[in-house]
């Protein structure tokens, strides 16, 4: 037996809840969520039963890219509170057995970070080599590399007649990981947060730190895993942490390195292969296409089977960059409750650590705003670009409704009072109009709510070892409507069967489930077990 099964880690049966702090709970009436606001809602999260909170970035930042441009790693942005508030949150969360996971951006800093302000003063400055510089002349860039957010990846600094490299915004200069001093500063900072009781880290675009711009290498550079192993040894392995690397360029082979059970790199990896399925081949996320259902099954099957016993999956539908899953692959009108529960049951039966994004457990939906009500710079940019390029306005807006990041960033819907109980002030972004019917207050005590479906699924991970260590077998691979799979260990069998669509279909696994008990389903009563109703999901179990 491999060591990740025999020596179970706490995070293998854990569920993580992601908070986008700006939109979760405002405690001081300024319209922006903050750390004290999160503390006010710990009881709710305790009720849900989650084990850890992942906070989107809260370090000090000029907010050129929603906090992913850090100007001080050892301070909290005043918008969210102070280091003292962070310490109080860690302490308070501990009472509910909840750990705090910080979002760390180690590929780049803000251009307002003191390291960069020093670095650009002169080539002899001790901080100069903290970043990636190339000689050149104005207008003649070192090469034609492009930044992720558009435009060149090189920015000219006339004072020192050099270009610096930035894979993202010009306000986000890339750190030079080849410099051991940079690595030491980063490790010292991680240890500083660990001493304050932080329970883990999510590492943003971590597969880009070993870039070699002269060879046009951005992801998966030659020294990538060397850096990971050094960082893990110097920091993470000194505590009992959960660590997750965000890797847009990962395939299962590489993910096995990231999440090697020997703990030499990270606990797990975020991969996004299933997330790009509903866009046109070779185009970007705004070019919509229907979800190829069989391909979704194939991809999830591959990650489940290939990482079994030699790596670890992260399971997620939603995050701060993605549209709401019930609107995306469910049905947010007539079957909102059924389809939200189906998507939850489908994901939470798999092997890995599930992540719930704030409001997902309530079945919060996408929004349809006028263009001026959106706050995301990406939405504003794509609107301007596409209208200027002659796209039909209705098509552009439909793409924004479907894929805009602000779908995930509207305020958490706590109750049916003004601003959904999020703030007493004016919210930084409009609240979704449906908050009067979709909110936490109406669901927490309703046994049939989406919230209580999630609560049960969270508790199952502690109750049924098969969810943590069972093998995975995809069933009915060619079925166009049903997603079904079996999990098995020496003592238990679990079978999940989900009707992914809004039509009634025949239930093909009646014999297989005959001697099994029903653990959870998303319809109150099973009138006729030989059919699956729209979006019906069932989880069967036997010991």
Please state what every model-predicted region is.
Residues 2-543:
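Active-site and adjacent substrate-binding regions of carbohydrate-active enzymes
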């Amino acid at each position: 037996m491999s060591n990740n099964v025999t020596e179970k880690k706490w995070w293998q049966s854990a569920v993580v809840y992601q908070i986008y702090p700006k939109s979760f709970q405002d405690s001081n009436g300024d319209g922006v969520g903050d750390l004290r606001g999160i503390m006010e809602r710990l009881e709710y999260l305790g009720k849900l039963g989650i084990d850890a909170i992942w906070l989107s970035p809260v370090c000090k930042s000029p907010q050129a890219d929603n906090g992913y441009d850090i100007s001080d790693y050892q301070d909290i942005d005043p918008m969210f509170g102070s280091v003292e508030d962070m310490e109080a949150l860690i302490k308070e969360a501990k009472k509910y057995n909840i750990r705090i996971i910080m979002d760390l951006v180690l590929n780049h800093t803000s251009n307002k970070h003191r390291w960069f302000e020093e670095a650009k003063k002169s080539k002899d400055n001790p901080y100069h080599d903290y970043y990636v510089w190339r000689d050149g002349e104005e207008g003649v860039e070192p090469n034609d590399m492009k930044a992720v957010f558009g435009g060149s990846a090189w920015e000219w600094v006339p004072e020192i007649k050099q270009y610096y490299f930035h894979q993202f915004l010009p306000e986000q200069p890339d750190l030079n990981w080849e410099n051991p001093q940079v690595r030491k500063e980063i490790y010292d900072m991680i240890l500083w947060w660990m001493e304050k009781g932080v329970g883990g880290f999510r590492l943003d675009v971590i597969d880009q730190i070993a870039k070699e711009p002269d060879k046009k290498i951005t992801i998966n550079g030659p020294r990538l895993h060397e850096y990971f192993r050094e960082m893990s040894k110097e920091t993470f392995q000194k505590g009992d942490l959960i660590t997750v690397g965000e890797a847009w360029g990962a395939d299962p082979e590489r993910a096995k390195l990231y999440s090697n059970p020997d703990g030499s790199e990270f606990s797990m990896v975020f991969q996004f292969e299933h997330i790009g399925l509903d866009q046109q081949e070779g185009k970007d996320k705004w070019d919509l296409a229907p979800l190829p259902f069989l391909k979704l099954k194939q991809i999830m099957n591959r990650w489940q089977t290939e990482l079994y016993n030699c790596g670890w999956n992260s399971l997620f539908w939603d995050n701060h960059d993605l549209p709401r899953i019930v609107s995306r692959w469910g049905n947010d009108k007539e079957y909102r409750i059924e389809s939200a529960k189906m998507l939850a049951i489908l994901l939470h039966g798999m092997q890995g650590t599930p992540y719930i994004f704030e409001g997902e457990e309530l079945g919060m939906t996408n929004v349809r705003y006028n263009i001026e009500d959106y706050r995301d710079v990406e939405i504003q940019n794509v609107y301007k670009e596409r209208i200027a390029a002659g796209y039909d306005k209705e098509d552009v807006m439909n793409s924004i409704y479907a894929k805009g990041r602000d779908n995930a960033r509207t305020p958490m819907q706590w109750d049916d009072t003004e601003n959904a109980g999020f703030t007493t002030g004016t919210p930084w972004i409009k609240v979704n109009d449906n908050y009067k019917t979709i909110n936490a207050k109406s669901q927490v005590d309703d046994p049939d709510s989406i919230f209580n479906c999630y609560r049960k699924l969270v508790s199952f991970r502690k109750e049924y070892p098969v969810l943590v260590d069972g093998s995975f077998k995809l069933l009915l691979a060619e079925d166009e409507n049903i997603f079904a799979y079996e999990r098995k260990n020496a003592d238990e069998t679990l079978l999940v069967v989900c009707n992914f669509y809004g039509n009634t279909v025949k239930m093909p696994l009646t014999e297989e489930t005959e001697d099994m008990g029903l653990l959870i389903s998303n319809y109150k009563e099973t009138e006729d077990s030989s059919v699956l109703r729209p979006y019906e999901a069932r989880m069967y179990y036997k010991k």
